[in-house]
Amino acid sequence: MGLVAAACFSDMGHKVVCVDNDEARVRLLCDGGVPIFEAHLPELLARHRGRGVSFTANLAEAVEKSEAVFIAVGTPQGDSGAADLSYVEAVVSEIARSITKYKVIVEKSTVPVYTNDWIRRVLHRHGVDPKHFDVVSNPEFLREGTAVADFLHPDRIVVGAGNERSAEVLRRIYEPLTSGSYYSQKGALPGACSHEHPACLLVTSAQSAEIIKHASNAFLALKISFINAVANLAEDVDADIEDIAAGMGLDSRIGPRFLRAGLGYGGSCFPKDVAAFHWVAQQRGIDFHLLQEVRKINDTQREVFFNKVLSALWTLRGKRLAALGLAFKGDTDDIRESPAIDIIHKLLRAGANVTAYDPAAMERAKEVLPPAENMRYAGDLYQAAKDADAVLILTDWKEFAKIDLAKLNRAVRFPIVIDGRNLYKPEEMQKHGFTYVSVGRSAKYQALEGKPRKART
């Protein structure tokens, strides 16, 4: 997310120097490449590259030129569930060797509470004069696929500062959004905020800001696990989870967002943030059992879907399956903790032959699902579905929601669709002759024709 922040800050009128220790990545960015799939990011980088934003592997030079230094390195989950802060420590140690005058060091990475104090101690350990720095927490609340829009049109900007001097630096940085001036400039990305309704900035303590990030992601993960648990009950009593979620979402106290039943959450944030938040609570002697249940339900949901596939096909050995989707959600190429990848692994171990297609994530998927005798990749979704015994919907890409059902029916061997994302209306699937299995809805929809469409060669 550091690259997104850099592009957006430059669009707000700031000069930004991006630092990465991967020189090949730096060269790629300098040459006009974009290493991640993210809407609007290529356009912003093209607009500001060489003017508002530059790229280097020289951290000391970048720190010397900057008033604020944003840390946006990864904090992966360790074996205990705790966030691994080794990358943070490494970059802070390097920053420390480059500080000669006052700098604001900004935590942008998702970190556990008291990391602010820990960074301060690391800087002290390296001999940095306390009057030469402040450490501020400024958590990001970005969704992959809409990260640029989320940054420029935020629900809130949280600044955890220990004094007014450092808080004022962050206020000035975000002033184009909080004053509304950004939204009046030519070429500004349209969205929820405007000159009349600018972004809101909340100043808190560093500890509060750090917990706001973890608690926010944990609560969103809770909503996802809750609706999936309700979906499993709804399916058992012939109710429809889509109607249930709609009815719940109309309550202004609940709201409709994150009430989508499916395969559970994945990606680089929710899994590790829920685990890290639970670990923090345990370290403080707090029994946060609710977070254990959130994780348990999420893990179970993948097994529930696998069992749906097994139930629909009786046996998986030798079956041809089309897997539509590899990314953990639509509009991204991120496969980290992707339910789709986990489910495909299970299918391969069960002896199924899987042909996968994803609009953006196939190259990344090949790193963890290398081509093999029973694992192939297709150029489009209809090619993936050719002669399939069943089509599995694993990622909620818009392309899949707009599929030509008649064309799909002609491509498959058996008209069976097992939808882990509830992209289709059951009545429409029945009309097109599919056996349709989804999440949290009645299993009564059967194909009008259940025989093979063509002999297998």
Locate the predicted segments by residue:
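Structural/interface elements that position substrates and couple domains in central-metabolism enzymes
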Residues: M1-T457
